[in-house]
Swiss-Prot record:
The gene is clpP3. Keywords: Cytoplasm, Hydrolase, Protease, Serine protease. The keyword Chloroplast does not apply. One of its GO terms (cellular component) is cytoplasm. Cleaves peptides in various proteins in a process that requires ATP hydrolysis. Has a chymotrypsin-like activity. Plays a major role in the degradation of misfolded proteins. Its EC number is 3.4.21.92. It catalyses: Hydrolysis of proteins to small peptides in the presence of ATP and magnesium. alpha-casein is the usual test substrate. In the absence of ATP, only oligopeptides shorter than five residues are hydrolyzed (such as succinyl-Leu-Tyr-|-NHMec, and Leu-Tyr-Leu-|-Tyr-Trp, in which cleavage of the -Tyr-|-Leu- and -Tyr-|-Trp bonds also occurs). It comes from the Bacteria. GO terms for biological process: protein quality control for misfolded or incompletely synthesized proteins. The keyword Hydrolase applies. This is ATP-dependent Clp protease proteolytic subunit 3.
């Protein structure tokens, strides 16, 4: 099921063929700095890559890990996988939001306690209900609808616990696209600290 936001301006879909390759030296430096980047749509492939990196870093050391998130959202279950893996490993993970942190990206963002949730000043956040589409028999459509409702209820509980807002307020807010600036997100309980430079991490 999808859980993604739409950009305010029309943009071409990401084309994997246009992605810039990361050299071995850059990968080695990222590993040494214990940094992971979650940029772009949340997919099964991205989840596999990120979870593999998390486990590898955890095996190498108990030192803190930094995860940078800039995502429009995507596949909910893939977001769940990253969310749960961040909680599963032993090292403390700090998450830094940048650009926009939307939908399934926000689900990943709240996988750590508020004091370890940071963002850059111009980051925007988007919370909303999951969506899904199915074709086929009426019974299949009914099953899909029930699953979306259950997923929405689960996400409401997650964001309520993460922000300190009541489940009723979360449910009301995400009835439509709910956008927050960095300052709004901090007031809402989504962000622990807004940072402007690496020295503040």
């Amino acid at each position: 099921m999808n859980y993604a936001g739409e950009p305010l301006m029309n943009e071409d879909e990401d084309d994997k063929s246009k992605e810039l390759p990361i050299g071995k030296e850059t990968e080695a430096n990222l590993f040494k700095s214990r940094s992971i980047f979650i940029y772009g749509g949340i997919t099964q492939e991205l989840a596999q890559k990120v979870c593999t990196q998390l486990v590898a870093l955890a095996a190498a050391s108990d030192d803190d890990i930094r995860v940078y998130v800039n995502s429009p959202g995507g596949h909910v279950e893939s977001g769940d996988s990253i969310h749960d893996m961040i909680k599963f490993i032993k090292p403390k993970v700090y998450i830094i939001g940048t650009g926009w942190v939307a939908s399934a990206g926000a689900l990943i963002y709240v996988s750590v306690p508020k004091e370890r949730r940071l963002c850059l000043p111009n980051t925007r956040f988007l919370l909303h209900q999951p969506s899904g589409g199915t074709r086929g028999m009426a019974s299949d459509i009914e099953i899909q609808a029930r699953e979306i409702i259950k997923m929405n209820q689960r996400l409401i509980k997650i964001f309520s616990k993460a922000t300190g807002q009541t489940e009723e307020k979360i449910a009301k807010d995400i009835d439509r696209d709910y956008w927050l600036s960095a300052d709004d997100a901090k007031d809402y309980g989504l962000v622990g600290k807004i940072v402007e430079s690496q020295s503040e991490l």
